[in-house]
Amino acid sequence: MSKHDSVDRDRRALLAAGGAMLGSALWPAGALAQASGAKIPIGTIGAGHIGSTIGGLWVKNGHKVFLSDRHPDELKGLVGELGPLAQAGPIDQAIAFGEAILLTVPYGAIPQIGHDYSAQLKGKVVLDTCNAVAARDGAIADEVEQNGIGVTTQKYFPGVRIVRAFNTLGYTIFAQEANRPDPKLAVPIAGDDPEAVRIAAGLVRDAGFEPVVVGKLADAKLFQRGAPGYGQKVTAAELKQKLSLTQ
């Protein structure tokens, strides 16, 4: 090999390394982790049926999960069942822990949680599973009916990267159908931030399902409670057909 060839080889290696470093600088840590298939830490706000079920599926897939709710001491038994990748504590600690957050509370609590934690959640990917129920949640259910649930959640969480997900089926179905043989159970998702949607899609797959990107947060009304995409225990191809999605 000539000296000139050696210099060219070293130059190409340096350029490749520099490009990788630049790419790392431009991508959020969580996005890089998801792109490489690595497991990111996840926090939950709420640890009821959906929170504990989806959180447990992520633990089984190798994610570290920090569960939180109003009474974290009551989660000790659940943490013991899930094993060393799971822990529990206050909401603020779960938010600090997670590169992504699962939001799973009664929808009537959304305004207060947004008021209390939006600043800490700013810039994070938040998977919103919550459904508005008029008899339980009051006036905010009317707001959801008028404006759509995705847009309404985003209103109360300014600066947060909201993605709607895991809201269409009950926890027992998620528990039973996770990681079934192909074709997997479809989980519709929607969000305004493309990178947040991509990360959420990866987390849906890690839980054992097939994500179906429906569109922006305004399009989440297509699978909110009572809409055509709600309650659909179907494959991705079937869900796309039901919602007239072209992709």
Regions found by a protein language model. Name each.
Residues 66, 138-146, 151, 177-195:
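Short beta-strand and adjoining strand-loop segment in the mid-core
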Residues 31-35:
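Boundary at the C-terminal end of the N-terminal hydrophobic targeting segment
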Residues 89, 156-162, 180-220, 225-230, ...:
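Internal alpha-helical scaffold of NAD(P)-dependent oxidoreductase catalytic cores
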Residues 36-39, 60-100, 104-112, 116-120:
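Conserved N-terminal Rossmann-fold NAD(P) cofactor-binding segment
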Residues 47:
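Glycine-rich Rossmann-fold phosphate-binding loop(s) that bind the pyrophosphate
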Residues 1-22, 29:
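N-terminal secretory signal peptides and thylakoid transit peptides that target proteins
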Residues 130-162:
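Rossmann-fold NAD(P)-binding glycine/threonine-rich loop
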Residues 51-52:
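N-terminal Rossmann-fold NAD(P) dinucleotide-binding loop
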